[in-house]
Amino acid sequence: MENNTSISGTIINVQHFCVDDGPGIRTTVFLKGCPLRCAWCHNPESQSKAHEYMFRQYKCTDCGICASVCKNGVHSFENGIHNVNREHCKLCGKCTLTCCVDALEISGKEITVCEIMDEVLADRVFYKRSGGVTISGGEPLFQSEFTFALLSACKDKGIHTCIETCGYGKAEDIKRIAELCDIFLFDYKLTDSALHKKYTGVNNELILENLKLICTMGANVILRCPMIPDVNMNENHYNAIAELANKYQSIREIHLEPYHPIGIGKAVSLGRTCDYDRSEFLERSELDDVCSYIADKVSVEVKVI
């Protein structure tokens, strides 16, 4: 298979030994950049493709070393408070290298497919019985050429592949990627299109069209459904999830994902606010009834992850 491993993309990181991003033990590549702006996003640093400055104030010990190495006046200390002037930041990263408590970070780095494959192949021993590579985000379709090249490189080595996608992208990109993807972890967030736009920034028509496309191509799909209190936890949405599973034989499983508030702290570290600011975790046990409700209506496995 022809493949260009010199293609580069923008990622957040590569995580190893992941167990919730597809079957088996997986190496998950988190790309940067997403066309959606989900109000509850737990990885807000993945929304913009640009490199971004993150300051975790709760970790800062006020040592002041960052201010001494920064030549742009980003850091200042007054009355025991560490102030960060993001407008002055040039993203040089010097301060992050001096911070020994991980309070400072530049989110985003450029990397080639070849460099990622070096990490993937180092993990290959764990893929012998199950597992593989998952491309997540952000949104893999947002960097479609890079995603295609990485999938091609994995298939050249016989490695199982998944992508986690919101489904918002060009049909031609999805068709190419589907030929190389063993499993789509396809997000289904909201049934009502107007509410979908309110909470994610886009309507859901294109997403549903692309779900239909990959299902008619015979792709293997796991429908992943974030459960967000006061947003989509209602019988209308549960019934729609079941209807999709019954409509498309390509949908092999349904995964319910309980809300967690980790994204709130990340948004603060980026200098933003979070539109959905529920601070309590949704416990897995709180979804037992939802899981049973949907399972009674479908023939595929439904589980909370």
Question: Where are the regions a protein language model picked out?
Answer:
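Iron-sulfur cluster-binding cysteine motifs and their immediate structural context
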Residues: 39-46, 65-84, 94-110
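N-terminal pre-triad scaffold of radical SAM enzymes
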Residues: 12-65, 82-91
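Short loop/turn motifs at secondary-structure junctions
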Residues: 37, 71, 95, 100, ...
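Extended, non-globular alpha-helical segments
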Residues: 55-61, 108-123
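Conserved AdoMet/S-adenosylmethionine-binding subsite of the radical SAM
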Residues: 114-269
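Anion (oxyanion) recognition and catalysis
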Residues: 91, 155, 215, 295-296
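Auxiliary Fe-S-binding modules of radical SAM enzymes
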Residues: 1-23, 229-305
